[in-house]
């Protein structure tokens, strides 16, 4: 019987462990205001963290924050006539406010201007210097101010500036202009880690996901990597953390920034046991595709040099565009994330971004598409189904519900029941790969099928003691219950409202509860509190 199939369901839950599940967003650069891409990184990471929280005996640590040093911050502050710290204080608050507005539940918010972080960075420097992985020598190369990095000759190209008609050199990766620079810097001996990095990538095929990015990094490693400049002369860059033992040099902003992932949980640790209890190694870093090299080559090499374990997984996502063009203030196609949340509501925006956002390809922001998703997926599919279930004509007593839960023959509804059985497991697999959009598509598939069943059976026309009516309503109720549980990481507020209206106790909303398709539940039918889950939008 299908009941046996339910019992054999593999629960994808983590065993109780002393090590918390730790995942991170990139920390955001404070030279400009938050944009849609920042919001997507926040809600994607938060949704994955919330899904982990649905598992029993799992402690979750999640961090976000702001990257506040470097030449760009120093330059913008000078332009605005404020101190770098004043600029950082103002803009860091905007990112913290966005995290709150997006209803994210990060346990840590880090700022790289925090003295504890700066102490961690200097300790890390001393560790890799003691390991013999830092040299001091003249560095010459093509430097990009906006990217704050040196590029090798092979990574630049000549182009003609359309405005000036003059030839210039730009980064092939970012398109930003580069200039020749020659100065004394500290260097990290990155080239010494080429073979170790390649070996790690070969042994851990899921280290960078999706696989297209794993392959991309591996190919870059095979072509060879050069030693990396990790400091700048103080006379050129004063806004940053001084190199230990040489106050005339400032630590490279990317080395500083990457260390946030360990400083936020207390690095340096006393021993391996204390690092594990703090959360390291991280289970997942979530990053945008524009910072792959820093996270997938530099960061693992830095950790190897310091004798620290590497993160379990680096999840890469693509960008958001408008009209298929990268968002830019000069083009007037920038969307204010605060305005979006204010106008459409946080759960609708979270749902839209997580449904439409992709990992391997850029996603195009479209207001009409957003409103279509809100109308069809949320109001008509989820909202209307809940509203219909709570009609006065469709009441089922608790006694009848208790008798129904003893039933073990669902042959007539076999396809839907099988889909419900598989739903939590497949959703867990999708979350593990960072594909939150697949969770939404899977849930919507179930809701569409159940809606068709509801329309086909027309339970409002059947007598109260009709077994067909009871079966239909209980199947719809459990489908909404399971959908509500699985949508909690995506739409925390609306999912809570849905489960509240169904009468699901707070302690019965875990992944384990979702895996039991017909878990004995006393649903609230026609409670009198069945307000519309999604009100009709007024223009």
Curated annotation (Swiss-Prot):
Primary location recorded for the protein, binned into one broad class: mitochondrion
Coiled-coil annotated spans: none
Cross-referenced InterPro entries: Met-tRNA_synth, Met-tRNA_synth_2, Methionyl/Leucyl_tRNA_Synth, MetRS_core, Rossmann-like_a/b/a_fold, tRNAsynth_Ia_anticodon-bd
BP terms from Gene Ontology: methionyl-tRNA aminoacylation; mitochondrial translation
Subcellular location: Mitochondrion matrix
Keyword Nucleotide-binding: yes
Residue positions of motif 'HIGH' region: 28-38
Similarity comment text for this entry: Belongs to the class-I aminoacyl-tRNA synthetase family.
EC number: 6.1.1.10
This protein's UniProt keywords: Aminoacyl-tRNA synthetase, ATP-binding, Ligase, Mitochondrion, Nucleotide-binding, Protein biosynthesis, Transit peptide
Name assigned to this protein: Probable methionine--tRNA ligase, mitochondrial
Native source species: Schizosaccharomyces pombe (strain 972 / ATCC 24843) (Fission yeast)
GO cellular component: mitochondrial matrix; mitochondrion
């Amino acid at each position: 019987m299908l009941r046996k199939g339910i019992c054999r369901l593999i629960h994808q839950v983590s065993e109780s462990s002393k090590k918390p599940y730790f995942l991170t967003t990139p920390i955001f650069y404070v030279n400009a205001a938050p944009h849609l891409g920042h919001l997507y990184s926040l809600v994607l990471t938060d949704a994955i963290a919330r899904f982990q929280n649905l598992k029993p005996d799992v402690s979750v640590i999640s961090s976000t924050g702001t990257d506040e040093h470097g030449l760009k911050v120093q330059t913008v502050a000078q332009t605005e006539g404020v101190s770098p710290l004043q600029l950082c204080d103002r803009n860091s608050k905007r990112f913290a406010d966005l995290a709150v507005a997006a209803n994210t539940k990060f346990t840590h918010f880090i700022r790289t201007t925090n003295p504890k972080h700066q102490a961690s960075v200097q300790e890390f420097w001393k560790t890799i210097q003691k390991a013999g992985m830092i040299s001091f020598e003249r560095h010459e190369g093509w430097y990009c101010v906006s990217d704050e990095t040196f590029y090798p000759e092979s990574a630049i190209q000549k182009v003609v500036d359309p405005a000036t008609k003059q030839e210039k050199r730009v980064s092939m990766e970012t398109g930003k202009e580069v200039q020749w620079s020659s100065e004394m810097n500290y260097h990290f001996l990155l080239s010494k880690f080429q073979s170790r990095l390649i070996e790690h990538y070969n042994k851990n095929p899921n280290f960078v996901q999706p696989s297209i990015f794993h392959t991309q990094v591996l190919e870059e490693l095979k072509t060879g990597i050069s030693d990396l400049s990790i400091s700048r002369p103080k006379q050129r860059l004063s806004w940053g953390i001084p190199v230990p033992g040489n106050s005339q040099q400032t630590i490279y902003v990317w080395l500083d920034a990457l260390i946030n992932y360990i400083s936020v949980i207390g690095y340096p640790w006393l021993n391996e046991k204390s690092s594990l209890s703090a959360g390291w190694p991280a289970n997942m870093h979530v990053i945008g595709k524009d910072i792959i090299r820093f996270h997938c080559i530099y960061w693992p090499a830095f950790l190897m040099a310091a004798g620290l374990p590497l993160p379990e997984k680096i999840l890469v996502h693509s960008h958001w565009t408008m009209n298929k063009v990268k968002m830019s203030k000069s083009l007037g196609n920038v969307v204010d994330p605060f305005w979006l949340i204010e106008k459409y509501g946080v759960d609708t925006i979270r749902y839209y971004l997580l449904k439409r956002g992709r990992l391997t390809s850029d996603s195009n922001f479209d207001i009409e598409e957003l409103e279509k998703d809100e109308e069809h997926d949320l109001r008509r599919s989820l909202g209307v189904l809940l509203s219909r279930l709570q009609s006065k004509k469709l009441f089922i007593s608790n006694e009848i519900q208790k008798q129904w839960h003893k039933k073990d023959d669902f042959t007539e509804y076999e396809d839907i029941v099988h889909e419900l059985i598989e739903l939590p497991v497949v959703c867990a697999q999708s979350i593990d790969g960072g594909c939150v959009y697949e969770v939404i598509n899977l849930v919507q598939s179930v809701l569409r099928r159940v809606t068709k069943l509801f329309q086909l059976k027309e339970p409002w026309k059947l007598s109260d003691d009709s077994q067909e009516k009871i079966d239909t309503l209980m199947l719809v109720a459990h489908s909404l219950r399971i959908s509500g549980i699985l949508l909690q990481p995506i739409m925390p507020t609306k999912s809570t409202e849905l489960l509240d209206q169904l009468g699901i106790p707070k302690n019965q909303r875990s992944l384990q509860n979702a895996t039991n398709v017909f878990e004995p539940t006393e649903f609230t039918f026609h409670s009198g509190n069945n307000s519309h889950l999604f009100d009709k939008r007024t223009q």
